[in-house]
């Protein structure tokens, strides 16, 4: 009997514990599971916790993620209230929106416990995603509005590049009724290939309700075609701006280009940029995109089925753009543009003042790379400015007799003058004025390689610097042997320089100090090179030598009547051939400005580059 009693007692205890333990699923646990699946983007797991989920359940949730650009999401259960077989769970959503910030809101989920089971399920409705989606045709949208782009400024504060009113023409796919007709009209009025429109409409991420940018035109162009394109079903229009200088080619390589973001640029910039945004594509517009653009104001809105805004739910204010100050002088730049307007060969011109400020730069052809800053060429006889400095250091004067023979042998290689000219025994000043290669090679034969390196480095050669754009300076490798030294004295061999650098060489002659060039005066530069003196008494002698080039030497085509202009011609051999092809150089001085000109494939500096420089010099102040 005792044993039976124990068994019965055990059964009684089990019954008590069974009554105390409630195996009914907790509504909080069900909601927590649903919210965790929502945060993870597991729509199948969410749907399994919903009573009668709609067929487009997953698509609706994913559309919110895609439209709002949700990078991360968290959903926290705040409370659960139940009564009988129904209840309400309240939650807080925290969404990280790419390129915007954190958006938090409070929402609720209706709960139900169906009659045929004990499990709590979500009684889903569109408002479960957000309370503002009570109407089935309402949806959440994200909009980005960029601030007006800041200007690029010239030295005096006037705009070098600024926006001009324009119209952005686009397409809303869902509103198009005749795509072929629309494409034909765009081709006829705007010259846009129908395949380009197909590519834009078919790009990844494009939704039927999106505004798909197609092209931007200035206001006069839009006014001329408005009657054709505006009535087309599906066309949409937005006010925007076009960027540029006073004329399309004005300082084009410095300013750069501005237009619709490319796939490569989008990958490079990342947030907060998206397809269709207008950005800098080259030059300063690209290099300083974030400064000039600021950041957009992002809004989260509720819109109805017709796309009309019902309510603004959140706003993230963007950052204001900041202007970019440059050293460009509008008047000097205009003179340079005029000088290269008719250029048929690749040409570059740079103007630098005695403080290293870049006052103007132009490169042609427009559609090719920036030769003014990024071109790397043998400087030819313009390098005689540097070689002359080394010779002056070692006692040569303008009156020192030198031998200007037709040819000279150096280490087994024969060097000659341009067009095989010769002057015989002449003063060094005349040899400089006439750009006599053989005289310089002979006179410099007693110099050591280190003498020439030291002179070159006083003019900034072998110094690294940058303007904030791709920049090439000057390179003077230590000559290896007699032949290479002879070539280097006349700016050949391995000696290279950009037009920018040769403009700084000329500027150093004006006041005796080489200054690293500056385009952006407010730009902070780590380890910027220090100014370098070119030597006591040297500038005065060099200016006199260069004055003779213009008055009686190889650079008379650069002369400006009544003006104190100086300069140095250069004819730089490159490539192969007999004779090899040449680039034409000229470095000119007037007032406190130095002008460097190169014409690729030019026959001779005095004949081709000097006239271009002369047109610039004529427009400069004394």
What are these language model-derived features?
Residues 34-42, 50-54, 65-69, 173, ...:
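Sec/Tat-exported extracytoplasmic proteins
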Residues 22-23, 29, 33, 40-88:
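Short solvent-exposed beta->alpha transition segments
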Residues 21, 33-35, 49, 96-98, ...:
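Second-shell loop/turn segments in exported
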Residues 303-313, 345-380, 389-601, 605:
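Beta-lactam-recognizing serine transpeptidase/beta-lactamase-like catalytic domain environment
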Residues 28-36, 44, 48, 180-184, ...:
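Solvent-exposed, polar/charged alpha-helical surfaces in well-ordered, non-transmembrane soluble domains
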Residues 66, 70-346, 583-585:
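Extracytoplasmic/periplasmic proteins that interact with beta-lactams or build/remodel peptidoglycan
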Residues 1-36, 40:
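Short, low-complexity N-terminal intrinsically disordered segments enriched in polar/charged residues
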Residues 25-29, 40-41, 51-56, 147, ...:
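Soluble non-cytosolic domains of exported or imported proteins
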């Amino acid at each position: 009997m005792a044993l039976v009693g124990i068994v019965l007692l055990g059964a009684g205890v089990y019954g008590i514990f069974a009554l105390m333990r409630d195996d009914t699923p907790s509504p909080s646990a069900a909601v927590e599971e649903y919210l965790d699946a929502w945060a993870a983007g597991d729509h199948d797991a969410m749907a399994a916790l919903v009573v009668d989920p709609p067929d487009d359940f997953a698509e609706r949730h994913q559309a919110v993620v895609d439209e709002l650009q949700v990078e991360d999401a968290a959903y926290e259960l705040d409370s659960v209230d139940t009564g009988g077989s129904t209840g309400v769970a309240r939650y807080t959503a925290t969404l990280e929106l790419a390129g915007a910030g954190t958006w938090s809101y409070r929402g609720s989920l209706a709960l139900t416990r169906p009659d045929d089971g004990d499990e709590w399920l979500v009684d889903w409705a569109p408002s479960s995603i957000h309370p503002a989606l009570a109407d089935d045709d309402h949806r959440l949208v994200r909009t980005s509005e960029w601030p007006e782009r800041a200007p690029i400024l010239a030295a005096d504060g006037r705009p070098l590049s600024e926006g001009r009113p324009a119209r952005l023409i686009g397409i809303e796919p869902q509103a198009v009724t005749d795509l072929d007709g629309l494409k034909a009209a765009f081709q006829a009025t705007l010259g846009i290939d129908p395949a380009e429109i197909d590519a834009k409409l078919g790009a990844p991420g494009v939704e039927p309700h999106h505004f798909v940018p197609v092209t931007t035109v200035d206001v006069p162009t839009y006014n001329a075609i408005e009657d054709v394109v505006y009535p087309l079903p599906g066309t949409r229009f937005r006010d925007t701006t076009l960027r540029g200088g006073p004329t399309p080619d004005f300082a084009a390589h410095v300013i750069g280009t501005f237009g619709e973001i490319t796939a490569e640029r989008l990958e490079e910039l990342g947030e907060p940029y998206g397809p269709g945004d207008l950005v800098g594509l080259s030059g300063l517009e690209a290099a300083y995109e974030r400064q000039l653009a600021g950041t957009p104001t992002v809004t989260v809105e509720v819109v109805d089925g017709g796309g009309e805004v019902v309510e603004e739910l959140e706003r993230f204010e963007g950052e204001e753009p900041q202007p970019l100050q440059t050293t460009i002088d509008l008047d000097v730049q205009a003179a340079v543009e005029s000088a290269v307007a008719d250029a048929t060969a690749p040409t570059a011109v740079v103007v630098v003042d005695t403080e290293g400020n870049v006052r103007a730069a132009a490169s042609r052809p427009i559609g090719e790379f920036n030769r003014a800053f990024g071109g790397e060429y043998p400087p030819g006889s313009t390098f005689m400015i540097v070689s002359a400095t080394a010779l002056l250091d070692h006692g040569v004067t303008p009156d020192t007799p030198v031998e200007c023979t037709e040819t000279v042998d150096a280490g087994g290689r024969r060097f000659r003058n341009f067009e095989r000219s010769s002057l015989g025994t002449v003063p060094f000043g005349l040899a400089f004025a006439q750009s006599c290669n053989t005289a310089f090679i002979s006179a410099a034969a007693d110099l050591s390689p280190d003498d020439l390196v030291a002179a070159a480095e006083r003019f900034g050669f072998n110094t690294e610097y940058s303007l904030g754009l791709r920049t090439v300076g000057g390179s003077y490798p230590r000559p290896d042997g007699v032949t290479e030294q002879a070539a280097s004295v006349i700016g050949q061999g391995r000696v290279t320089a950009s037009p920018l650098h040769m403009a700084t060489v000329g500027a150093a002659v004006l006041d005796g100090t080489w200054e690293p060039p500056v385009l952006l005066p407010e730009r902070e530069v780590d380890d910027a090179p220090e100014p370098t003196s070119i030597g006591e008494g040297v500038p005065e002698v060099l200016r006199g030598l260069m004055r003779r080039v213009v008055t009686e030497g190889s650079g008379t085509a650069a002369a400006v009547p009544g003006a104190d202009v100086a300069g140095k011609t250069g004819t730089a051999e490159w490539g192969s051939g007999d004779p090899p092809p040449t680039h034409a150089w000229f470095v000119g001085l007037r007032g406190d400005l130095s002008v460097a000109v190169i014409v690729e494939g030019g026959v001779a500096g005095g004949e081709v580059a000097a006239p271009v420089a002369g047109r610039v010099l004529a427009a400069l102040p004394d």
